[in-house]
């Protein structure tokens, strides 16, 4: 597989979709970003691309209800999935969304990898584990980013990373776990390197 290095600073907004069935055709390579409503997903995308307002951040958890697609280069897309697990969303909507999310992860042919973001202080909640299960069952590689790592001391951070790495072993999937902080620039290089690796099959053809 040929090694590539994409310039994520050139990433731009492509389109928004109200649901999984409305996203553009299944071509190129997509990498999806998922996480609980307060996991810092938009902040991570902005840090990766070095753009303050590429993905809109909100003080109100659950604000991102649309699926937002961003283009790194033609045929290379990042997909920002709506935050899950927000209490104020009606139960029926939650159930419907979780069902379509599972479908997307398991049936989308151009999906090359999944980045799951979790607050380092509260990792592996039920829905996080559900996302991991779906991805593993679809043979999809996963990068778990433990966000807000700057909130912990270095030793506490290392302990949490070790704990999560051990906790995910039973899933038996291709799962990498890294600490991440947009504020302190922790893990941004590892995120970019993983995306490069996942995007590379198209370059190798």
Curated annotation (Swiss-Prot):
Q: InterPro entries per the record? A: G_ENGB_dom, GTP-bd, GTP-bd_ribosome_bio_YsxC, P-loop_NTPase
Record-linked HAMAP family: GTPase_EngB
What would be the name of the gene that encodes this protein? engB
* GO process annotations (BP): division septum assembly
| Record-stated family | Belongs to the TRAFAC class TrmE-Era-EngA-EngB-Septin-like GTPase superfamily. EngB GTPase family.
Q: Name one GO molecular function term.
A: GTP binding
Q: Which cofactor does it need?
A: Mg(2+)
Q: Mind telling me what this protein is named?
A: Probable GTP-binding protein EngB
Q: Where is the EngB-type G domain?
A: 27-201
GO cellular component terms attached to this protein's record: cytosol
Job description of the protein = Necessary for normal cell division and for the maintenance of normal septation.
Q: Where does GTP bind?
A: 35-42, 62-66, 80-83, 147-150, 180-182
Q: Record-annotated residues binding Mg(2+)?
A: 42, 64
Q: Which UniProt keywords apply?
A: Cell cycle, Cell division, GTP-binding, Magnesium, Metal-binding, Nucleotide-binding, Septation
